[in-house]
């Protein structure tokens, strides 16, 4: 499960304290916080990306990828965005790019032997 970010102060913290990564058309800023269980996530898709249907398609894709991989994400606050190219990316590649970005910022949880 993923929760939304509703607190405005958190967005200021992304600029100050967030770790950032970019993989292809996807970018991610993360503040790892053990108290943020389940992970909190917001999506930022600017108007320059395209029309509202394109932006919504990207947002839905990001949300689906985040839900599918929520168990691999460290507790924390996530701000995720993407370029227009992300809307045309196959789902498997979109998942891979999401996980690569999370790995770059140190937000992936490695499964323990007991969990396998």
Task: Label the model's feature ranges.
Residues 1-116:
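Positively charged, solvent-exposed patches that mediate nucleic-acid binding
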């Amino acid at each position: 499960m993923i929760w939304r970010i509703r607190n405005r102060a958190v967005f200021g913290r992304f600029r100050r304290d967030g770790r950032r990564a970019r993989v292809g058309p996807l970018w991610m800023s993360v503040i790892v916080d053990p108290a943020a269980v389940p992970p909190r996530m917001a999506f930022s898709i600017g108007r320059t990306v395209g029309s509202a249907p394109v932006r919504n398609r990207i947002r839905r894709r990001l949300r689906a990828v985040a839900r599918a991989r929520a168990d691999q994400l460290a507790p924390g606050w996530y701000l995720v965005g993407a370029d227009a190219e992300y809307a045309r990316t196959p789902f498997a590649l979109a998942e891979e790019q999401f996980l690569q970005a999370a790995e770059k910022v140190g937000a992936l949880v490695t499964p323990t032997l007991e969990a396998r």
